C-alpha cells in the first residue's frame, strides 16, 4: 500500500502456488479504513485455512474508528478473541492426529500521520522509503531466536532441523503475544505485508523494484509474476 497526500491506495492478492493442494493464506485489504492484514494458516486438513479466515473475518467486522489508537486496540482484541476460539476448536477436535489450528498474522493500521504494525509469526511487513527497503517486522521463528540470542550464527542456525518452527502464532498458545511497532508515515512511503511464500520466492532486488512502481496494483502484479515463475512451493500472499 502507498501513502499519498490525502489517502492510502492498496492492492491485494493471494495464490495457492504450484505445489500446495489448498490455499491456507487469507488477506484483508481495507484502505478506506486504513486496515490491512495477511494471515498464513497452519494445520492439517482445512485447519490452517479456517484459522487464517477467522482472523480476517473477525478484523473485517470491526466497527470503523477514526481514532488510530482505539482502532489498534480493537484489532488486538479481535486477534485475542480468535486465539481463544482456535484453542477451543483444537480442544473439541483433539481426537484428530493433526489437531493443530493456528495462523501467523501481520496487520497494519494507519492514518495520515502514523501507522502501527502488529504481528505474530513469520509473515512480514516491509517499508520502501527514499529508494531503500526496510524490513520492519522480525520473524517469530526458532531460526530468528537462535540468531537473536547469539546461540548460533545465521548459517549455523539455518541448518537447525527446526529452524522454521514458529515461536508465536495465533492459536499456538493459550496467551497470544503480539509484537507492535509504531512509526510515522511520509508521502511516498510504500508498505508491503506478505507471507513467507512470497518473500522466500523473490529477491530483495525484485521486491525493491516492485515497491518502486507507480501503483500498488502494479507492484503486486510484478511480485506475483516473479514468485510464480519459480517453484512456488508455498501459498503466496501480499498486500
Tell what function each PLM region has.
Residues 1-239:
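PP2C/PPM-type serine/threonine phosphatase catalytic domain
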